[in-house]
Amino acid sequence: MSSIPTPPDANGNPLIALAVAVIYAILYVLQGVKYGVSLLTIGIPSCIVRMLQYSLTISLGFPHLLALFAGALLALFFLIRYRYLTRYAQLKESALPPPSPPALASRLLPLDGDGLGLPDSRSQTSSFHNYLDDFLSAIRIFGYLEKPVFHELSRHLQTRRLAAGDTLEIGGGEFWCVVEGKVQVFAPDASSQGTPTPSSDTNSPTRPSFNGYHLLNEVSTGGTLSSLFSILSLFTEDIKLSWKSSADDEGEEEQIFEGAPEQSSAKLRVRRANSDVSQLGPDSIGVRAMDPTPLPESIDSHGDSSVPQRRRERSSSIDAAGETVREREGIFASASLPISSTEPPSPRRSQSLRSSPRLNSATNLLSSQSEHLRSSVPRKAGIEIGSKALKGTIARATEDTTLAVIPAAAFRKLTRKFPKASGTIVQVVLERFSRVTFMTAHKYLGLTREILQTESSLNLLVTHPLPRSFYTGGGMQALRARFQPEALAKESVHYDSLKSSPNARVSSKDYFNYVPASPTVKAPSLPAMTPKPLSPIIHKSSLGQTATTTVKNEPLNGGSSPLDETRDKVPSFGLSTAAATNPDASFRHASPFIRRTSAMRQQVAAGDLAMSVHNLPDESGQAYYRPTAITPGLSKMDTWQRRYSSSWNLNDSPHTDGQPVDPQRDDESLLNESFDLKEAVLNSIAKSIGLYQEAESNSDMIARSSMAPSVSALSTPNSPMFPPNAGTPLQGSTRSRPPHFGNVLDLINASSQNEGVIGGMLREAAFNSRPDDEASSISMSLHDSQGGASGVDRKIMKDLERHVEILFFKKGSVLVKEGERSPGMYYVIDGFLETSLPFRSTSSNQENPNSTPGSKHRQSSFGSSNERPFKTALGLDTSKGKELDDGSKKDEALFTVKPGGIAGYLSSLCCTDSYVDITAKTDCFVGFLPHHTLERIIERRPIVLLTLAKRLLSLLSPLVLHIDAALDWQQLNAGQVLYEKGDKSTDFYIVINGRLRAFTEKNDNMHVLREYGQNDSIGELDVITAVDRSETVHAIRDSELVRIPAALFDAISIKHPETTVQFMRLIAGRVRRALGDEMNGRVPGLPTTDMNLKTVCVLGSTRNVPVTQFAGKLKNALEEIGASTSYLDQGIVMRHLGRHAFARIGKLKVAGWLADQEQHYRTVLYVADSPPASQWTLTCIRQADLVLVVSMGDDPSLGEYEKLLLATKTTARKELILLHDERTVAPGSTRQWLSNRPWIQTHYHVELPGVVTPARPIPPVHDAAAIAAFKHLREQVETRIKKYRGLRPFTRPRRPPHMNDFARIARRLCGQQIGLVLGGGGARGISHIGMLQALEEFGIPIDAIGGCSIGSFVGGLYARETDLLETAGRTKQFSGRMGSMWRILSDVTYPFVSYTTGHEFNRGIYKAFYNTHIEDFWIPFFANSTNITHSRMEVHRTGYAWRYVRASMTLAGLLPPLSDNGNLLVDGGYMDNTPIQPLRENGIRDIIVVDVGSVDDTSPRDYGDSVSGWWIFFNRFNPFYERRVLSMTEISSRLTYVSSVKTLEGVKATPGCHYIAMPVQQFDTLGGFKRFSEVMEIGLKAGRETLKKWKEEGKLPTGLVDEAKGSKAVQRGNRLRRMSI
């Protein structure tokens, strides 16, 4: 069947058709099977047989084979060239977007408060005003109040309703607050007689005059109307101003000054001895008679010493306090009115509180600087001291208003019922007054003299000289003899010129040859043994006696202020005439006292006049002193006798050796035979500060109200408030008995770094002996309260005596500098201390854009000032050198502290920075009471603060009190808006605590302008220029502000033009900085520096992160650079505040204590070491100016703590810390972290040995057999080699201090970062490596690097792992590639875009960086380039490093532009060859700029109008041809610098910019790559010379907050390791 026949016709029958179809289908299948079988069995085999029978012959000659081989090589070349060698082109990732600005809390999602237990403080306030909430917000000014105290005040709460336009006098002792409505506060104008009710009529178009009243403030709902000082007077009714001597001594003083009526100041002292009444008349302070009108009748004549007369004086002097409105006519006016010109007082009581003050036309101006010698107040009507000055203050309702008032009777009752709580309220009020009113008047209102007149008056008031017998009996000669031999011993080593001086020896026949040293008087470096007495001695019984005769003092030579002339008339027992007239004595004064080196000294004396502040061992190399970071004063003095513990605990306070001194154990037979100078000095200080209070008829009232101790008698060492191992000088070996100062003082010493005052609103809680005992905080010791002060005083004095130091200061030494925290109180034994107001330059605070007047000093006030007594006591203070000599000519002398006076009284007790400089006018011997000891006195004896409050009440001018009444203390919650853009500018603000951010919104984008930290001012420019708000300001965290009304500023400016001058300086500085930013090309809208960071939260991403270890190392790094730091974790806070610290009842306690920590430390670290949902973790986040998110780099996903951080909606700046075990980062690993966290502002890589990051399981990949065999062979070879290498211990190399990562973070927190900018210049940039080596040799840390062109290449290599050797090696490899002519020729192409393809250039850069990202670099790095698509400069901080380094090095014409997401990038030098602005925007203050592109060749070039390249080419071989034509590369290079020359000039003029031009201009841009070693050597030499020059000139940046303290960190650390066991 060869073929299938045609099927028959079915004739229309379907069945037949179907059968035919089936049959034919089977036939077709069978036919296909036949065909397939025949093909497989016959067709294919036959075809194969035929193919094998054919034969093919190919014949190729050599040319053909050569061409074929060349073609194969060419194909292989193109395959490798464009497939293998261009793999770098595949490394393309777009740069990460810039970090999102901190969003406002209102933009975030609602807070899940139910799940986290967080109240959303940023929710909109309800329209329903809660009466109680407004009242509570008002009384928060008093700090934390216990329940009984709060209930006591609430019982007396009253309300007053005022209709719109109604007035109310509020100048009494009541406490007023606005519950609802708005009230205007008016004060009577001293220049016109005021009517009782102010009206709104204006008499002048320039100044609103409300019928003789000033508008001070406008208070809305929740604000307070009362001045705090009007309330202080209620608590100080029974306090006397000064110590009163015995009646016999009074009579002696009266006889002494009987014939000297012109000495008004002296008579005032006599009257103050006769009475505790404040003599507030102008005669007591020397006011010139300006008008024949009679003086107020309270100015009395010299009265007798009888008690009735004292009572009359006490009652009659009230009116003078309020009716004498003092006149301002100068700084210090001389005394001119004799006492006899006054009239005797009339024995009448004071007027009622509601009466208006009578204004005398003769004394209607503001107070004079010299008119502040005030004394005490009456016993009953004491409220009129503070209120008299404020009397007549009127509140007028602008709308229907409801006021809440606590009457004066409530505070009186509170004083008697809860004396301890009253003392706490006084302390809070004083603290707020010093931090708010004093700071505002001093820094912003230019009223420093108004405060200084109070200080000068206080100085006169607290003068209590030593007994005259001390001076007449040879005590001063003996004191000098004790100091002098030690100075001569040192002089024999250091001062060879004085070695042979005959006057340098002290006569052996001095007082101390006969009188042995008291065992409790341990002067510095005294001999260990003192001979027995050979002659009669002075007994201690003469301590309290007053001299019967006086030594009249001659004025000092030189300029003395008018006050000095007045004070010369004050009797002083402290000046030795021998010291003033004897040349030998003057020589002894001038000799520097330096601690001798003795073979008996086995360790450092704790009080060796602080010679050891230099941290250098003595000449024998045996001892040195290591001060702690916050030491406020001097150490405990001893004579190195073997009576202390042999172990020297370096963690203890330098004021103690860890064991108290027992006077009974040393020379008991001589105890009563020697004059105890320390005890005498301490007694005088105790009288001056009010620690001694005499018992009178109302002693029981005093004991109940003011002398009650502030520590409960229930305190026991077993209390939870006792931290373990809290060895203090007050406990020592007697731990079993209760300490003298109670458990709170142990808490103060619980940490060696905690020397601050436990104050603020938390004082009450810190004193709880049992945190769960609610009544313990307001209880008191019955024995102490009823038994008077004698026993308590004796115990306190016995303990405090050990802390008194006797110091010698050379003439010209600076004891305290303006703007620094006072180290303590100085009692002048002999000599004079001068208080002067330093000249404030308007350019002194231009450095910090956020700085306010005086804030520049404040940065160093936390560290350096505490150690100043150590240096200045020996004249070794380096800070007084040339700067002091130049500035002393401009300083304005204010007053002189004479023997018996106290310097630093106000600043020490108020815990404020000093407003003046205190210098030694002559060689001085002073008694020094350290600041921490004063704090303990304050804690134990509130009478000291009450006395200060009483004195301030009587001495402060009405202007300061009116300012205090007008200032408003305001509190903002986190996220709350202070004011919005477009609001009316009615007030400006000062930040007390917290942080705020200013921003503007444009096109739905938020642009952060700046951030405000502690002591920064907000909005004053808008107020002065009378424009609407130009920005929106909101609180980053809970913040405390001072609101200064514009009305107050206007009122003060009229009377005090210096206030306007002060503000004009402030505004001029702001405008000047703004113009400077504009001239320097600063990009608008970018945030300014944020150096003023106070609180830092250390938050781990997960529970496994070692935040405690990280924070501990960070704290040590902060203190090593000189920044005092408070370390707070949950355990420390609970030990201080009790177990209820984080409960709702303890919220105010925690807030007050944390605010106090911020006030006393440069930086506060909040360590979140508790579970995520705990209250402490939430507190850490809420309190932070900056949040450091610490992670170990194991999992880039968000951790539980980070989720909590986002849920709290905090708007604080957030930065990421990635911990690594070694100094290397896996390429690309950082990008995953940053991409998941767009809210991170910046990140840091930190090396923390011991961090174990578990390796992720890698999916198994089956290698080919050949690769597996090769790996097996490699392992075998490595195993065999290890046998011959031996066992070596694994030692991790210790990083040098300038490469410490924790120090880098610390410098960032303190705003002390050092940046490095490396400029472009082709091959000349090889010299950058030499500069880097010079920086390492000088130990200069580098915290950030920026580069342009070749500078980005070298800087990027160094920033990668900070390895100088690797940087030099890879740069040399790149130079070899660029110097190879063959590589350049192989890359040449048709010059349409450029002469080369750029491939070889790309390969050279890629071989140096490979696939590393910029964010993987160990040090923050950026490179700049020029975007020719959009004609702008680009700054690259993320992305593949090789690409953006290549973009920054793209020289147009030689290389094609780099395409990055459609943008064409070329060399950054076309825009800015030394880009410093990106570093400035990151808050880096000191920037070292290395410029290698400067072209100094400006010689004229003349070569005609046309140039033949061939002619120049052939003339290259002509030795006599001088080429004057620039090559293309040189022209292109110069073209780069033409565009950036203006920017370079701005860089040179930028403050904080250290510019160096490398002398490498003789090298070509490309040809210099062949001379690598030569260029690098030139850079190293130039770098060394420049850094050495800067160091000699004092311009070398070190990154230290405190130069003196931080420079010794390395030496201290090394020596401690060598001397440890």
UniProtKB/Swiss-Prot annotation:
SMART domains: cNMP (SM00100). GO terms for molecular function: lysophospholipase activity. It catalyses: a 1-acyl-sn-glycero-3-phosphocholine + H2O = sn-glycerol 3-phosphocholine + a fatty acid + H(+). A motif (DGA/G) lies at residues 1467-1469. Residues 188-209, 250-379, 545-566, 648-667, 711-735, 772-791, 839-870 are annotated as: Disordered. Keywords: Endoplasmic reticulum, Hydrolase, Lipid degradation, Lipid metabolism, Membrane, Repeat, Transmembrane, Transmembrane helix. Coiled coil: none annotated. A motif (GXSXG) lies at residues 1347-1351. It is an enzyme of class 3 (hydrolase). A nucleoside 3',5'-cyclic phosphate 2 binds at residues 951-1070. One of its GO terms (cellular component) is endoplasmic reticulum membrane. GO terms for biological process: lipid catabolic process; phosphatidylcholine metabolic process. It comes from the Eukaryota. It is a multi-pass membrane protein. Its EC number is 3.1.1.5. A motif (GXGXXG) lies at residues 1320-1325. PROSITE patterns: CNMP_BINDING_3 (PS50042), PNPLA (PS51635), UPF0028 (PS01237). It is found in: Endoplasmic reticulum membrane. Residues 839-867 have a biased composition (Polar residues). PANTHER family: NEUROPATHY TARGET ESTERASE SWS, NEUROPATHY TARGET ESTERASE/SWISS CHEESE D.MELANOGASTER. Intracellular phospholipase B that catalyzes the double deacylation of phosphatidylcholine (PC) to glycerophosphocholine (GroPCho). Plays an important role in membrane lipid homeostasis. Responsible for the rapid PC turnover in response to inositol, elevated temperatures, or when choline is present in the growth medium. Belongs to the NTE family. This is Lysophospholipase NTE1. It comes from Cryptococcus neoformans var. neoformans serotype D (strain JEC21 / ATCC MYA-565).
